[in-house]
UniProtKB/Swiss-Prot annotation:
Any one of the GO CC terms: cytoplasm
Swiss-Prot/TrEMBL keywords: Amino-acid biosynthesis, Cytoplasm, Dioxygenase, Iron, Metal-binding, Methionine biosynthesis, Nickel, Nucleus, Oxidoreductase
InterPro entries reported in the protein's UniProt record: ARD, ARD_euk, RmlC-like_jellyroll, RmlC_Cupin_sf
One Pfam short name: ARD
Primary location: cytoplasm
Keyword Zinc-finger: no
Cofactor(s), by name: Fe(2+); Ni(2+)
Protein's job: Catalyzes 2 different reactions between oxygen and the acireductone 1,2-dihydroxy-3-keto-5-methylthiopentene (DHK-MTPene) depending upon the metal bound in the active site. Fe-containing acireductone dioxygenase (Fe-ARD) produces formate and 2-keto-4-methylthiobutyrate (KMTB), the alpha-ketoacid precursor of methionine in the methionine recycle pathway. Ni-containing acireductone dioxygenase (Ni-ARD) produces methylthiopropionate, carbon monoxide and formate, and does not lie on the methionine recycle pathway.
GO molecular function: acireductone dioxygenase (Ni2+-requiring) activity; acireductone dioxygenase [iron(II)-requiring] activity; iron ion binding; nickel cation binding
Lineage, uppermost ranks: Eukaryota, Viridiplantae, Streptophyta, Embryophyta, Tracheophyta
EC number: 1.13.11.54, 1.13.11.53
Annotated protein name in UniProt: Acireductone dioxygenase 1
Reaction catalyzed: 1,2-dihydroxy-5-(methylsulfanyl)pent-1-en-3-one + O2 = 4-methylsulfanyl-2-oxobutanoate + formate + 2 H(+); 1,2-dihydroxy-5-(methylsulfanyl)pent-1-en-3-one + O2 = 3-(methylsulfanyl)propanoate + CO + formate + 2 H(+)
Gene3D superfamilies from the UniProt entry: Jelly Rolls (2.60.120.10)
Length: 188
């Protein structure tokens, strides 16, 4: 089943904050994202401090560090420059875990054929991008998102811009996606 918050992107030079749907639109299912190692949950952002499901996810996956990040022109110095940095294609050596508490934005991930898939995260969406997946982030035209960032251990957010085919996390990701190793915690 396809959802209306993930789709194959039309690549062009228009504003990165636009949806960039193909014509006709080509939506992507949660199962397709899961095949790429991307996990998704729909949670209650209004009571995240007491959310039992969030607590269980954090405990089972070892997410013991959390902080909050507000992204909007009024709160981020050099906003346009930061947005350009987030939109540069990169990988991380660790998972990227983001929970959208307010607002919305887009995570773009590369599929197995190197096509961009745009994932629209909105209030209540929690997404986990596996270590080694090529991706980027931008806000949508609302220009605001409040994200919870989750980490295993001390927060490390080092971006390695493409190409990174020899990076250990990238090699491991390719191996896992190719051989479908491991069974992730069930996401919905």
């Amino acid at each position: 089943m396809a959802i209306e918050q993930a789709w194959f992107m039309e690549e062009n030079d228009e504003d990165q904050r636009l949806p960039h749907h193909r014509n006709p639109k080509q939506f992507v299912s949660l199962d397709h994202l899961a095949d790429l190692g991307v996990l998704y949950w729909k949670l209650n952002p209004k009571d995240y401090e007491n959310d039992q499901e969030l607590k269980e996810i954090r405990e089972s996956r070892g997410y013991n560090y959390m902080d909050l990040l507000d992204l909007c022109p009024e709160r981020v110095e050099n906003y346009e420059e930061k947005l350009k940095n987030f939109y540069t294609e990169h990988i991380h050596g660790d998972e990227e875990i983001r929970y959208c508490l307010e607002g919305s934005g887009y995570f773009d991930v590369r599929d197995k054929e190197d096509r961009w898939i745009r994932i629209w995260i909105k209030e209540g969406d929690m997404i986990v991008l596996p270590a080694g997946i090529y991706h980027r982030f931008t806000l949508d035209t609302g220009n605001y998102v409040k994200l919870m960032r989750l980490f295993v251990g001390e927060p490390v957010w080092t971006a390695y811009n493409r190409p990174q085919e020899h990076h250990p996390a990238r090699k491991n990701y390719i191996n896992n996606v190719t051989h479908k190793v491991g069974v992730p915690l069930e996401a919905h």
